[in-house]
Amino acid sequence: MAGGRGAPGRGRDEPPESYPQRQDHELQALEAIYGADFQDLRPDACGPVKEPPEINLVLYPQGLTGEEVYVKVDLRVKCPPTYPDVVPEIELKNAKGLSNESVNLLKSRLEELAKKHCGEVMIFELAYHVQSFLSEHNKPPPKSFHEEMLERRAQEEQQRLLEAKRKEEQEQREILHEIQRRKEEIKEEKKRKEMAKQERLEIASLSNQDHTSKKDPGGHRTAAILHGGSPDFVGNGKHRANSSGRSRRERQYSVCNSEDSPGSCEILYFNMGSPDQLMVHKGKCIGSDEQLGKLVYNALETATGGFVLLYEWVLQWQKKMGPFLTSQEKEKIDKCKKQIQGTETEFNSLVKLSHPNVVRYLAMNLKEQDDSIVVDILVEHISGVSLAAHLSHSGPIPVHQLRRYTAQLLSGLDYLHSNSVVHKVLSASNVLVDAEGTVKITDYSISKRLADICKEDVFEQTRVRFSDNALPYKTGKKGDVWRLGLLLLSLSQGQECGEYPVTIPSDLPADFQDFLKKCVCLDDKERWSPQQLLKHSFINPQPKMPLVEQSPEDSEGQDYVETVIPSNRLPSAAFFSETQRQFSRYFIEFEELQLLGKGAFGAVIKVQNKLDGCCYAVKRIPINPASRQFRRIKGEVTLLSRLHHENIVRYYNAWIERHERPAGPGTPPPDSGPLAKDDRAARGQPASDTDGLDSVEAAAPPPILSSSVEWSTSGERSASARFPATGPGSSDDEDDDEDEHGGVFSQSFLPASDSESDIIFDNEDENSKSQNQDEDCNEKNGCHESEPSVTTEAVHYLYIQMEYCEKSTLRDTIDQGLYRDTVRLWRLFREILDGLAYIHEKGMIHRDLKPVNIFLDSDDHVKIGDFGLATDHLAFSADSKQDDQTGDLIKSDPSGHLTGMVGTALYVSPEVQGSTKSAYNQKVDLFSLGIIFFEMSYHPMVTASERIFVLNQLRDPTSPKFPEDFDDGEHAKQKSVISWLLNHDPAKRPTATELLKSELLPPPQMEESELHEVLHHTLTNVDGKAYRTMMAQIFSQRISPAIDYTYDSDILKGNFSIRTAKMQQHVCETIIRIFKRHGAVQLCTPLLLPRNRQIYEHNEAALFMDHSGMLVMLPFDLRIPFARYVARNNILNLKRYCIERVFRPRKLDRFHPKELLECAFDIVTSTTNSFLPTAEIIYTIYEIIQEFPALQERNYSIYLNHTMLLKAILLHCGIPEDKLSQVYIILYDAVTEKLTRREVEAKFCNLSLSSNSLCRLYKFIEQKGDLQDLMPTINSLIKQKTGIAQLVKYGLKDLEEVVGLLKKLGIKLQVLINLGLVYKVQQHNGIIFQFVAFIKRRQRAVPEILAAGGRYDLLIPQFRGPQALGPVPTAIGVSIAIDKISAAVLNMEESVTISSCDLLVVSVGQMSMSRAINLTQKLWTAGITAEIMYDWSQSQEELQEYCRHHEITYVALVSDKEGSHVKVKSFEKERQTEKRVLETELVDHVLQKLRTKVTDERNGREASDNLAVQNLKGSFSNASGLFEIHGATVVPIVSVLAPEKLSASTRRRYETQVQTRLQTSLANLHQKSSEIEILAVDLPKETILQFLSLEWDADEQAFNTTVKQLLSRLPKQRYLKLVCDEIYNIKVEKKVSVLFLYSYRDDYYRILF
């Protein structure tokens, strides 16, 4: 191929080749190169005559094969005879992966290349070019969307796996890094310990040489020298932390570098609740405490230059915060953070403590880092050593020195306990002795809590832990005494005491031995308190000791609850054994976290639910279930549990548990009363440190206050400073009678000796009363009792689980200057009003509203709590008061703060405070709110005397007297609101709802107000663009499949019953026939109405919105749409009926409205002076009742009333005319049982109705009877010479006329005048009536209203247009509950056959279908309801089942075999008859059968009625085992054997059903047998037939064999065995001749023998 790529060369001397030769050589070369892809297209390529080449090459991209090839093409070349001198024809075929454009481009290039190589063989060159072109365009084809999605998913999955692998590798690196870091920390810790050990040895040697010498202030300190102090700093009050919780978390932290100071150091800033910050230079670490997990640093306070010590705890977690923490790990970290942050509140109380034998806490700081939280606490610097050094180096301490140490330890410990602080870890290492020999106690309370938190591994899995300490851990204050005894014993022996039980050496002095026994006795009850130990002879040796040692005084005031309580360290620990804990719901479900408060009522404890992890406040109250107040307690708990409002503390659960506890006069319960003050005052300790503000127990903590802590007094400055007052003079509300109105949620406000008004704890009897008297003696006179004996008694505790509020109280907020923030002030006030409006609506009164009872949660929202005096009674009398109450009211404690009594007295309303008996209502809370609102708007009052004076001036009976600095201009609105609230006349005082609607309150603020403003502006401009946009967005919402399914799921439950539908149709047809007899026509009104607030002021209609945003209503009843229709069409005369659906909205969102079927019958007439239409309406309902025997049995009564008479009664009872509509609504809700009696009374109280007026109103509305019987009551109204008499006469005249007309119409029902009937009074004028029967439901008789209506002339003009003229017609209407009639008939009238058709036409075979169709058409023409069976292939059994299910009596079988005849089957009275009838006579035959059937049913109904009447009159007795015959009626014995227990009414219904069903058969059998019994069972028809196989006449063995065979074939063997046993008993034992086995499930029976 000369000139071609790869062509063989030709020599110069060789002759030139011919065209065929050249062509043949090229083809051979191409075939060799391309092999199978080469194809010679010549038909005779091997023939003698050579044709020009015509070949096809299948070409692929060069060098690619298999899956890499995405393109290919066939190159077809047809050469002319003179090729290659003439260009061949080139074609590209079967292109794959190339677009048409690419193919055309390739072809044009090939043609150009062919022209270029003309004269040379070129096919290989062309093929090579094609392959190169294919290589350039070898690209995968575009994928489908599905393939791209799969590929994308695969890539994402691959990426996810790579990312997971990368994270795993990163975590592995972090773990390895952390392990390395921990190893380095351990090495550093070992170094520090070695250095500390050396320093301790040096200090110990120095202290042994001279205990009285002073140490160099600049010398090194070890862990034994834990404190050093500066007198200036101790006396500097500005560094004490206050109760501010939010700013304390805003810590600043910085590190000094070498440029700032000569040596590198850390600077810590402590926020002290003021603009000034305490700056402390953190120095060298001087030691550590492994037990408490802390590090100790020297520090310098820059403001005074004094030395302080810095304690540091570090909570470290293994991983760094970030995306590599699991959600569970993050929750654990958050939990630990909250626990640490909660310690700040406790520290606020501890910082206030000051005692010569207690080391002072100064300030606290929290520092959050990426992988840890650092807690720094500044403490007083003490120059001295710990007692641990004495144990290590000095040996035993002499007794005289030990006595001195013990007295100081007891003094400090008693001071801590008197302030409700428990040390928890008292040991030699945290008791210091300074240079003067003074003992100092440190590390109390908070150190143990922080140590427990920081020692816990955040990511540690739950496992069994073993304590390193062999000695048991004792909790509470008695635990501190236990540890004190061990400490003293160790000091006396010179070594640690690790023996348990503790053995006291006999070589110790006798008084010291006895002292130690009082400390380390195993029984907590017998262990003495520090107060008692201070009086022990070891501390106070006496020259003459009595022969019989006296027991310390009774410890009634002892506190068994610590301040901050770790898990299982609460007061219950000492009294509840481990076995009791295992069966206690409280200990099983909750983990105790903290005591929130306690008092005479019990204790409130912060707990965490182990299941949901949420925190709750649990109130634990000792109760006596046998007491008369226990029912009252349960009622209050139930009442409060119903409250659910965002501004009310939520009560969740309540339960009672029984526990065993030690009993005795010296052992109060764990939740006993507070600590008495007398002994502390006697020792010279300031009362202000032990009561009121300085109570640490009450101080734990403000951010996490309980929702209902009821040990508060309003005189405290903070919720964190509440402590229960004791003694008769410190009660809060002595005017409240606990027996009548108080309860478990209130404090004991009476003296301790008045036991009748308190809750009875445990088993209180005469002994306990005398014990209380003895305890009073101990308090007042200091007399002592002997040690009690150890006994046990059962105690019951009521546990109440409540919502837990975290922040503070309104008292805290007021004291912090709430008056400056006006916006927040009004917002909180509005939230208080919202909460009060809610509880008042529920019929409750708080009665103890004050700032400390109003809590603020973490979101700064109000939560009203402390329902200690809350009550659900209508009105209360302030009965007898204490004569000296006034003197007690204005009294302050030595600290300058008010007592609890002052707090309540300053807020209580005049009607409650009055000395005379007077009723009061919810408005007493509004008066208290007035005082509260003044305090919110006024600057905090510093002294108690100022506050008493200002608030008493504000309570002036004439008008409130405001302070001069309460500016009129700035506080104008506040003054108006306060004056309105503090009106001494309750009637002029507003309700919470009225005040919320008042213009005196500014609108809601912030985002809520802005949103409301935008929505209001948009909705007012219905033609604006914004309105259309909002509507478009609303109607473009997507409905999810879940909502679509659940919207009407309760309606479409699959419980459709054809019989129910047919019964409803039967009822409607029957009622319509009655209406038509009265000349009524059917008239249905439009479905939708525009929303009408005036008409539906009370009734809640189902509201919807159309596409334009207009609100429309579905009909609530059929009366309003008809009145609108009459008014708009000027109808003057019409009788109409209508049966339509009415709707009720659901309380749940996104649910289909509830549908009811209602029937309306109305008479509109132009005659205005006749009462005959009213009587006709009532008579029509009477006819309906008579039509249905099921309704006759219910004994309906007709209730009548008149709107004029009702109005006269309300006006007579003192109800203003402008409030009549509200009273109508309340009375209507009461009648329909929408409101309880308590709620009704509460709503009346809100209308300022006096108790006398309310009693008079009840006297009238409860009257019901004949008109003559009520005349004395009605005449009392007529005697009045006011407009009321005219109203009464008008109403009485109408009632007399209607009653007379009803008698003339022959109505046999009882007609009663019901003065309390208030059926839709706003819509009616004149006579109103109801048909009422009392039926038994759930063991009580409840009224069922079948129909109700009245005259509604005045309703029509409300719908007339402005141009409408002409007279207003008289309109009377009644609404009938169709659903109730259908249900009654369905349940009581099983004998009524209601068929959807008279005749079923069946084609026997497909060939007869045409005849069947023609026959059916003739039946329809004749007016006979007929159906044709669509499926001609039905079997006989299926046909019978279809007829039975649809209650079809007659079947016409059309078959070609019968010729011109039709076979008619009849299913009548369990008899099947069959008759051949000519096809032409079928219509007449069926008409005759139907007439006969109607007659038989009428006779059967009458017989059934007679039977039912005989049954009701007791004419036969099943118990006698006999039956009686009344004429031709047989009354057999009927036994109902059901698989489950049946109610009496259901059993009677089945018995009546059986007797009616088998009446004909029984009459026929009466002639043959006199002993007949019926056994009714709940089995299907098929099973009934199986019983025919039983052997009755054989022996017992044969019978049992057939029973086993029967049971083996059927399910429900247990029930079937009972049926068989009963049958055998009837046959063998009773020897009954005839037994019917009847299935009340399928209405089928068989005669067994």
From Swiss-Prot:
- Polar residues composition bias: residue spans: 705-717
Q: Where is the composition biased (Basic and acidic residues)?
A: 778-787
Query: What positions does the domain Protein kinase occupy?
Result: 296-539, 590-1001
SMART domains to which the protein is assigned, alphabetical: RWD, S_TKc
Query: Could you tell me where the Acidic residues compositional bias lies?
Result: 731-740
Q: Which GO terms describe its biological process?
A: adaptive immune response; cellular response to amino acid starvation; cellular response to cold; cellular response to UV; defense response to virus; DNA damage checkpoint signaling; GCN2-mediated signaling; learning
EC category name: transferase
Quote the protein name from its UniProt record. eIF-2-alpha kinase GCN2
Q: What is the stated purpose of this protein? A: Metabolic-stress sensing protein kinase that phosphorylates the alpha subunit of eukaryotic translation initiation factor 2 (EIF2S1/eIF-2-alpha) in response to low amino acid availability. Plays a role as an activator of the integrated stress response (ISR) required for adaptation to amino acid starvation.
Q: Which InterPro entries match?
A: aa-tRNA-synth_II/BPL/LPL (IPR045864), Anticodon-bd_dom_sf (IPR036621), CC_SR_Kinase (IPR050339), Gcn2 (IPR016255), HisRS-like_core (IPR041715), HisRS-related_dom (IPR024435), Kinase-like_dom_sf (IPR011009), Prot_kinase_dom (IPR000719)
Expression by tissue, per the entry, reads:
Widely expressed. Expressed in lung, smooth muscle cells and macrophages.
Q: How is it modified after translation?
A: Autophosphorylated; autophosphorylation on Thr-899 is increased upon amino acid starvation and in UV irradiation cells and inhibited in presence of IMPACT.
Q: Which GO terms describe its molecular function?
A: ATP binding; eukaryotic translation initiation factor 2alpha kinase activity; protein serine kinase activity; protein serine/threonine kinase activity; tRNA binding
Going by the UniProt record, its keywords in alphabetical order are:
Acetylation, Activation of host autophagy by virus, Activator, Adaptive immunity, Antiviral defense, ATP-binding, Cell cycle, Coiled coil, Cytoplasm, Disease variant, Growth arrest, Host-virus interaction, Immunity, Kinase, Neurogenesis, Nucleotide-binding, Phosphoprotein, Repeat, RNA-binding, Serine/threonine-protein kinase, Stress response, Transferase, Translation regulation, tRNA-binding
Q: Residues in domain RWD?
A: 25-137
